[in-house]
């Protein structure tokens, strides 16, 4: 599929662009201060998109549809400018490193920021250092409580056989064409989903902004033998990946949440963060809701706001090496068995039944939700 001309340029259109593939459309909303307003805008984008698609339909599931061959997946193109070519070569690198089908896994990215007025309600004179520390605390708490999002937003327990190809996995047969895990919440967030195991070696803990930036830059500058062996140029002598680093660019960091800062397209994200600090966070671990045309509802958005506000205002100690292991273990447990009633999560070094963990967390969210809201 090619990008319809009616949708404008995927390089410059701020509302409708493409992700990895030409057929993988990405809808982008502006910053909006209400769940209803955000949902209405997203719904409008869907209506406009459908009016421009002819006989094509949107696939409303995070895991890709059936593929005959990975060669059928056409990379997104952005023209011949330096910026456009860099975006295309980056995608060629993703295809080379991970395969095209993995890159067609899709989800919801939810950006969250606190207004200047709200920061002043928290602190009489909020410096950028204060804001950075609070956002990092939010990120740490999201990682600690990601089980909650997997439970409420996980919607991909099944995948077509063609997604796995010849990869090893522990999924079970479901019908003639699909594979699944009976108690899974999100195969998208599992080891067979949108992941890169080598990135765990970067040891990112979000305890300090400078530490985070240095780890990402180290990932860009550190060659990985497997990627190096693939070569920077293809058989025709054309670039097929930006570099042989663990990360080609900052955006290749696959995590459930990332700190972000807007700026000129010519500026590196790591430099923007280092110079200006965190402007907002990007929550990436949300599956597309297959039962809603827009992939997310206004009620879902309100729940995310509540969850993220809880993460922002709650105590958030630094993440230790031991807690990294606990967070990763809980993540694996929830993506693979999160629908099972006897699931246990590690909390403070000991196992707790998910029902007990859920009751405590729901009570905390309930107290926050009861606070009168002033817009």
Segments the model singles out, each with a brief description of its role:
Residues 1-95, 102-108, 130-140, 144-147, ...:
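Terminal catalytic/cofactor-binding subdomain
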Residues 42-46, 50-53, 262, 266, ...:
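Short, hydrophobic/amphipathic alpha-helical packing segments
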Residues 374-375:
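C-terminal amphipathic alpha-helical interaction region
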Residues 102-115, 280-287:
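Histidine-centered divalent-metal-coordination microenvironment in nucleic-acid enzymes
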Residues 29-38, 116-118, 287-296:
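A generic structural motif
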Residues 274-275, 281-370:
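Substrate-recognition/cap regions that form aromatic- and gly/pro-loop-enriched pockets
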Residues 79-97, 104, 113-275, 293, ...:
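Loop-rich catalytic cores of soluble enzymes, especially ATP-dependent carboxylate-amine ligases
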Residues 38, 69-75, 122, 292-296, ...:
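A short acidic (Asp/Glu
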């Amino acid at each position: 599929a090619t990008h319809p001309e009616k949708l404008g340029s995927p390089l410059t259109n701020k509302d409708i662009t493409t992700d990895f593939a030409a057929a993988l459309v990405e809808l982008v909303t502006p910053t909006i201060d209400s769940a209803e307003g955000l949902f209405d805008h997203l719904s409008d984008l869907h209506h406009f998109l459908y009016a421009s698609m002819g006989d094509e339909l949107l696939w409303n599931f995070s895991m890709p549809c059936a593929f005959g061959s990975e060669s059928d997946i056409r990379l997104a193109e952005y023209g011949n400018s330096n910026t456009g070519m860099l975006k295309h070569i980056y995608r060629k690198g993703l295809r080379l490193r991970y395969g095209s089908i993995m890159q067609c896994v899709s989800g919801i990215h939810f950006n969250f920021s606190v207004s200047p007025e709200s920061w002043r309600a928290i602190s009489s004179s909020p410096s950028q250092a204060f804001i950075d520390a609070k956002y990092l605390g939010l990120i740490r708490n999201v990682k600690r409580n990601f089980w909650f999002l997997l439970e409420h937003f996980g919607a991909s327990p099944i995948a077509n056989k063609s997604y796995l190809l010849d990869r090893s996995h522990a999924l079970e047969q479901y019908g003639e064409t699909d594979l699944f895990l009976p108690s899974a919440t999100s195969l998208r967030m599992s080891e067979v989903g949108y992941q890169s195991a080598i990135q765990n070696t970067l040891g990112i803990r979000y305890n300090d902004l400078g530490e985070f930036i240095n780890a990402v830059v180290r990932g860009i500058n550190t060659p990985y033998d497997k990627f190096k062996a693939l070569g920077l140029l293809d058989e025709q002598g054309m670039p097929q990946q930006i570099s042989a680093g663990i990360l080609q660019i900052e955006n290749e960091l696959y995590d459930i949440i990332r700190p972000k800062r807007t700026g000129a397209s010519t500026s590196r994200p790591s430099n923007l963060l280092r110079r200006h600090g965190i402007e907002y966070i990007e929550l990436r671990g949300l599956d597309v809701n297959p039962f809603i045309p827009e992939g997310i509802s206004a009620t879902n958005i309100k729940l995310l706001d509540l969850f993220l506000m809880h993460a922002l205002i709650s105590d958030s100690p630094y993440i230790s090496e031991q807690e990294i292991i606990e967070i990763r273990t809980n993540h694996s447990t929830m993506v693979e068995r999160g629908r099972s009633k006897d699931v246990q999560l590690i909390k403070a070094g000991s196992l707790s039944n998910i029902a007990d963990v859920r009751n405590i967390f729901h009570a905390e969210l309930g107290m926050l939700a009861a606070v009168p809201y002033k817009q």
